[in-house]
């Protein structure tokens, strides 16, 4: 029976690009380096979303039209794709939890991710495969055991809403008023580039030999040094 590969949108721009060897081992052996971001970023996210859910997306920036964030009654917590194949007709599935999905008043849809990060105009380029992956899920939706993913089409806007600490304006002995700069980085859809990338990832995973250590990967360097030290110990 042909293998159906499974990818999380969030791993496509991080684990997959960071190190081919670590990604290969992670997907085949379920071993994760454990390099998760500090919990404080989740805390920022938990504060940002409730506020922005009450706002019109047009107020976020000039690039977004009138719209509102879709809530849990319209979207399941986890969304999945169905029937996707790469450029070599190999089956794969996408499954994940989108940050922000927007329904615009003109009937179109948008996908936005909130990031507390150093602001840059092209920040969304760092997340281009993640954002397009969510667009592909909504274009070819599937179902989990508990919920069906809705088909949302067309998805006309994708991007990253960036937050960066700016200043503290007031404080008491238990809290403070904290301002953050914001900036929206838009991303154009690129379906062809996405499928080219997925095809390369599946090519990697179908290799029978584990990829070589990456010189620019800290985990590879750490593991390689451990091996070197062990070999020296065995020579004694």
Please report, for each region that a protein language model flagged, where it lies by residue.
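Accessory terminal regions of nucleic-acid processing enzymes
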Residues: 18-22, 152, 188-236
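Hydrophobic/aromatic-lined pockets within catalytic cores
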Residues: 29, 119, 139-143, 206, ...
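Short aromatic-enriched loop/helix-cap "lid" or pocket-rim segments at secondary-structure transitions
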Residues: 63-65, 170-174, 232-233
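Short catalytic/ligand-binding loop motif for oxyanion handling, primarily in non-cytosolic enzymes
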Residues: 24-25, 32-33, 119-121, 166-170, ...
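Mg2+/Mn2+-dependent nuclease catalytic core
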Residues: 82-196
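Hydrophobic, Leu/Ile/Phe/Ala-enriched alpha-helical segments that form helix-helix packing faces
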Residues: 55-60, 138, 142, 201, ...
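Metal-dependent nuclease catalytic cores that hydrolyze phosphodiester bonds in DNA/RNA
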Residues: 1-108
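Short, solvent-exposed polar/charged micro-motifs at secondary-structure junctions
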Residues: 72-81, 168-172, 228-229
